[in-house]
């Protein structure tokens, strides 16, 4: 099958279209013909080798972390899906590879595609949708009337997280560039800060939750926004010892993560704030919840551009510019 493959770790020039064998099908697996996949920041982080300590992949590797497509075949223990079903998913960490014509996915990681979305729109949802759900619903337990600050409101996670937080009844603040202010307000944000003109920590106070998708440099400023008892939740690091425990990482690696996260954990603790690192995981059941919200009109995916599979490298480069509004899609079929 045709796929976008990396043979070594490196920056933008790494990766090419080539041939790989079709995936094996285990008893509880579903073989999906991929129609569309989406680009995530995680793809570039995997390609560069930035996360190889916590996600040790064997090369050559097919990149790609979410998709939408059609069921081709199911394993003998699969009961929820049958050939012809239109589905979407974020595969498990150790079984990525959606920039390809086929993928084998665990039944429990898969969900039926929202009926009101195209394949391209559906492919834009799984990773960012699950990230927003696991941060806001699972970890933050966001309630109506609470205040949440979502960094980078026009990005892939931001566009979904704003809509989910509004559905949950929260007051939502976010940041974006000058040209996107009105557009992000239209997604539902109550307060939009133009980061080119204002510093968020000078404007925002007494927030319950901050969702940070940016670098470590904004984490300390984010602490100033939160009230005592608030939660600073980062999806971009630094990872914590708790995360190492969940991932089953080695003792030495756990100590490394303890060191790299020590500074922000200590500063948060001094302010009575809880710091959590969230690395989203695959979940078909949560995707079904998200699908219901999409079908009800509470969440609308945002697609910026669509590239053909042969232009996957260009799609990755475009996302790397930071200019995409919402998600960038790779059309496979």
Question: Residue locations for each model-derived region?
Answer:
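A glycine-/small-residue-rich N-terminal strand-loop-strand element
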Residues: 68-92
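Glycine-rich phosphate-binding loop and adjacent beta-alpha segment
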Residues: 218-296, 332-333
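Short, surface-exposed secondary-structure boundary micro-motifs
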Residues: 35-36, 74-76, 92-93, 153, ...
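N-terminal glycine-rich beta->alpha transition that marks the start or flank
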Residues: 11, 20-68
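Mid-domain Rossmann-like dinucleotide-binding core that forms the NAD(H)/NADP(H) cofactor-binding site
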Residues: 126-197
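NAD(P)H dinucleotide-binding glycine-rich loop of Rossmann-like/cofactor-binding domains
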Residues: 80, 89-152
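C-terminal hydrophobic helical "lid"/dimerization subdomain
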Residues: 279-333
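A short acidic, Gly/Pro-enriched loop at the edge of an enzyme's catalytic core
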Residues: 201-209
């Amino acid at each position: 099958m045709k796929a976008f493959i990396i043979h070594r770790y490196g920056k933008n020039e790494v990766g090419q279209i080539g041939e790989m064998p079709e995936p094996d099908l285990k008893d509880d697996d579903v073989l999906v013909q991929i129609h569309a996949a989406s680009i995530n920041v995680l793809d570039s982080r995997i390609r560069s080798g930035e996360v190889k300590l916590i996600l040790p992949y064997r090369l050559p590797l097919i990149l790609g972390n979410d998709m939408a497509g059609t069921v081709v075949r199911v394993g003998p223990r699969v009961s929820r899906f049958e050939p012809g079903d239109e589905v979407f998913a974020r595969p498990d960490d150790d079984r990525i590879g959606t920039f390809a014509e086929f993928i084998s996915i665990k039944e429990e990681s898969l969900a039926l595609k929202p009926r009101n979305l195209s394949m391209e729109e559906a492919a834009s949802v799984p990773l960012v949708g699950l990230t927003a759900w696991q941060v806001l619903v699972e970890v933050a337990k966001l309630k109506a009337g609470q205040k949440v600050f979502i960094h980078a409101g026009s990005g892939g996670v931001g566009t979904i997280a704003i809509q989910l937080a509004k559905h949950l009844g929260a007051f939502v603040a976010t940041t974006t560039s000058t040209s996107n202010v009105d557009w992000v307000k239209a997604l539902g944000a109550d307060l939009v800060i133009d980061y080119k003109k204002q510093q968020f920590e000078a404007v925002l106070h007494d927030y319950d939750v901050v969702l940070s998708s940016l670098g470590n440099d904004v984490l300390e400023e984010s602490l100033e926004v939160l009230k005592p008892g608030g939660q600073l939740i980062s999806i971009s690091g630094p990872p914590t010892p708790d995360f190492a425990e969940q991932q089953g990482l080695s003792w030495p690696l756990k100590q490394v993560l303890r060191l790299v996260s020590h500074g922000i954990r200590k500063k948060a603790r001094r302010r009575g704030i809880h710091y959590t690192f969230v690395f989203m995981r695959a979940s078909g059941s949560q995707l079904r919840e998200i699908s219901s919200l999409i079908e009800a009109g509470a969440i609308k995916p945002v697609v910026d551009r669509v590239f053909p599979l042969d232009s996957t490298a260009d799609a990755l480069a475009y996302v790397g510019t930071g200019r995409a509004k919402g998600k960038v899609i790779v059309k496979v079929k």
